[in-house]
Amino acid sequence: MMTRFLATTLATVVLSGILMGCGASDDGSIRQSTSSEGAADHLTDAFANADSESKKNAGIASEAIRKGQFQKALYAIETIKKKPEVDFDQGVAINDSLINLERELIYRAEDGDKKAIAAYELLKRINRN
């Protein structure tokens, strides 16, 4: 229980730090999700007008997040991240998704979910690159 609290707190602090360093959108606010599902929506919205490949990968990632297919989501997000055309709002959506995924994976890994443990290891590798 304490580990979950610490993980959630850490994820919140990291997200706040990232967002404070990134600036804000036109209306002065930055969208932050409080769940994996919200992050999936954020990703879809941010890439609605992107190039077809990025939009497709954002859709794949969002759907995979909703279905709990976390490795698939991470691969799609990693593909998007590598594109040089990612704008500010899209970058925020990517970070929002990764932070919410990390929190979800930690919760599931603590409960012994082997797929979550494998996905968390993948997330750590992605974050190193």
Outline where the language-model segments fall.
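Alpha-helical linker/edge segments of TPR/alpha-solenoid repeat scaffolds
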Residues: 98-128
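Bacterial signal peptide processing site
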Residues: 22-26
